[in-house]
A protein has these predicted regions:
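Conserved acidic
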Residues: 1-7, 19-591
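Thr-biased low-complexity repeat/linker tracts and other Thr-enriched repetitive architectures
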Residues: 579, 583, 587-602, 606, ...
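Histidine-centered metal-binding segments
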Residues: 628-640
Length: 640
């Protein structure tokens, strides 16, 4: 007889903030399918006793934080890490970039059946802060917040207010997850849910045929052509106060490319030398060596990562006397030839692909329809489904993870686990979707060359207040792939990528603030965009003090200490940046880290190199969050 499906719970800890006394002072859990079954208590031992007997699936929002307390407890209570599912051991999925996905605690076996409780990260399924989930999903949310710095000795009695907040937090996640599960979205991450939904539509059989599993060797070559979004500040405006201007962004930029552009499928054919046109294999990735100089009046589009000679986040005006070695999709190569003069070009080899349009049509039609005809939770889920798919195609097959252990000082440390690989999904798709995204943004920006201030992935910022001719026929607030006129500003100042301020024209309509224009506004909204800056620090920013070197000691930094994790205030400084940098698509995750603004210092070197686009990677790029864990390369880690 098949046993009952496992129960699922939403859980949360409240913890002390002292390095020398780091512990859980409150826990809460709530049954995701029956909100009347919940408990809030003040002892981690009591919580863990429940965990060990409940044999359920638990969800914490931001497992990296709460999970650190759990593993501290397990290590101190006779449990050892093991990948083999032995009794009284626990296993983890923690990527080498320090992304936490799972803790699986094994108590033993009943016959063949494993007796275990598994803990997941709801943040991977709903990549937003709890308050934003409550807003977007139209769930009730308690006003106010817990006072995190209040003295709370061991055995502290939870106040009625605190009790209410904890209950509210676990209930929001419980409600949101229940809606997801009811939609059949039961995978470990939003990206996996999205890929599963896509496979359901085109069928697994067709998926395998259209997107064959490439060898790790081929995948590695294709991946060299994978890049993130185009994020570039025009030197002409750097650090200067600018007058009126406007911002446009593409509605659902990546889904729009997936909907209409020519995209690769099938097994590639390897070729030597230069690609020769082949109507059966119209797309290609070319390995070239060359020197290059930017043409007069053109935006730079080439960025070289992992090189000794070039800054990884700068768009280059010249190869600077070195011979550049590049792997480029034909989309990027054509753009490069249009923007640069190339010298001493050597075409080495490449891969060519069959291509088609419309593979994603049914999937995007389905979820776009749901998005436009729903509100609240279902609308948000539809957005998540649409925006999480492209990143999955380029998931990194190297899933070597981290293994936790207790260090001499009693805090958690992490060592690299054994090398581990999984099958790639279909990286060429990721390469071309992101390439078409860059192409769309860069061609629009180039057509407005005399006005372009800044680009970020799917947006262009221009001087002046007239809609440029080049996009005037494709401006629309909602249509897929059209440019939305996002805002008009009175003045602005840009320091580097993802670091700018604007005074935006707003008008009050029936009590709400909506976008205004120079001839029609009632309010000016001061907007601060600055990767890694907390809301508290943003309140300190003015047009006068917003410059390179601006610094405040107010940024919470997460540190592993005996017992768990504490947040300590560290210094946040605006550093002088290059004129460009790869960052990636929207992915909701950005917003989450925007909201959290937490750096993790976990010993080891000073943080990894940065990879190409892939949902997660690029948003780390975007956030400039340093997770100091001393290993290179960004990874996308997905098991189930």
């Amino acid at each position: 007889m098949k046993h009952m499906p496992r129960k699922m719970y939403s859980c949360d800890f409240e913890t002390t903030t002292k390095v020398e006394d780091c512990r859980v002072w409150a826990y809460g859990y709530m049954n995701i399918e029956d909100h009347s079954e919940y408990k809030i208590g003040n002892s981690l031992d009591e919580f863990m006793a429940w965990v060990l007997k409940v044999q359920a699936d638990l969800y914490f929002h931001n497992l990296k934080f709460d999970g650190s307390f759990i593993i501290n407890w397990l290590e101190r209570n006779g449990f050892k890490w093991s990948a083999d599912g032995l009794p009284n051991t626990y296993n983890t999925i923690i990527s080498r970039m320090g992304q936490w996905y799972m803790i699986d605690i094994c108590l033993g076996y009943k016959g063949k059946r494993k007796i275990h409780t598994v803990i997941y990260d709801s943040l991977k399924k709903l990549p937003f802060p709890v308050k934003k989930i409550a807003q977007d999903f139209k769930l009730t949310v308690k006003k106010g917040d817990i006072d995190y710095h209040k003295e709370r000795p061991v055995g502290y009695k939870i106040t009625p207010e605190e009790y209410a907040y904890i209950k509210n937090d676990i209930q929001i996640i419980a409600e949101a997850l229940l809606i997801q599960f009811k939609q059949g979205l039961d995978r470990m991450t939003a990206g996996s849910d999205s890929l599963k939904g896509f496979k359901d539509i085109i069928t697994t059989k067709k998926f395998k045929k259209v997107f064959p599993t490439l060898s790790l060797g081929l995948d590695k070559e294709v991946r060299k052509a994978y890049r993130g979004g185009f994020t570039w500040l025009n030197d002409r405006f750097k650090g200067k106060e600018i007058g009126e201007g406007m911002v446009f962004d593409i509605n659902s930029a990546y889904p729009a490319q997936m909907y209409s552009r020519l995209l690769p499928y099938g097994e590639p054919i390897v070729f030597e030398g230069k690609y020769v046109w082949d109507e059966d294999y119209p797309l290609h990735i070319q390995h070239i060596r060359c020197e290059f100089e930017l043409k007069e009046g053109y935006i730079p589009t080439i960025q070289i990562k992992q090189s000794l000679f070039y800054k990884g986040n700068e768009y280059l005006k010249s190869s600077g006397g070195e011979i550049a070695d590049l792997w480029l999709s034909n989309v990027d190569l054509e753009l490069m030839k249009e923007h640069y003069d190339l010298y001493n070009v050597e075409y080495i080899s490449g891969l060519k692909f069959k291509a088609t349009t419309g593979l994603f049509k049914d999937f995007i039609d389905k979820w776009s329809y749901i998005k436009t005809t729903s509100y609240g939770a279902i609308k948000q889920l539809a957005k998540l489904m649409l925006n999480s798919l492209y990143g999955k195609f380029a998931s990194n097959p190297d899933v070597t993870g981290k293994v936790p252990y207790l260090k001499e000082n009693g805090a958690l440390g992490f060592r690299l686990g054994e090398e581990e690989y999984k099958d790639p999904v279909y990286t060429p798709m990721g390469v071309f979707i992101t390439a078409w995204g860059r192409y769309t943004t860069i061609t629009a920006a180039q057509a407005c060359y005399d006005r372009i201030i800044y680009c970020d992935t799917d947006s262009i910022h221009l001087t002046g207040t007239k809609i440029p001719d080049v996009i005037k026929d494709i401006v629309h607030p909602k249509k897929l792939g059209y440019w939305e006129h996002e805002s008009t500003f009175k003045r602005a100042k840009y320091l580097r990528q993802k670091t700018y301020i604007q005074d935006i024209y707003m008008k009050r309509v029936r009590g709400y603030l909506v976008q205004g224009s120079p001839d029609d506004y009632t309010d000016i909204k001061f907007s601060v965009k600055c990767a890694g800056m907390t809301d508290k620090i943003k309140e300190e920013v003015t047009f006068e003090n917003f410059k390179v070197g601006f610094s405040r000691k107010m940024k919470p930094k997460a540190v592993q200490v005996p017992g768990g994790v504490v947040l300590v205030d560290s210094v946040f400084t605006i550093k002088g940046g290059g004129s460009g940098g790869g960052s990636g698509g929207g992915s909701g995750l950005n917003d989450f880290f925007e909201a959290q603004k937490i750096e993790w210092h976990e010993g080891g070197g000073s943080g990894g190199g940065s990879g190409g686009g892939s949902g997660l990677n690029d948003f780390f790029e975007a956030q400039k969050i340093e997770w100091h864990e001393g290993h290179h390369h960004h990874h996308h880690h997905h098991h189930h």
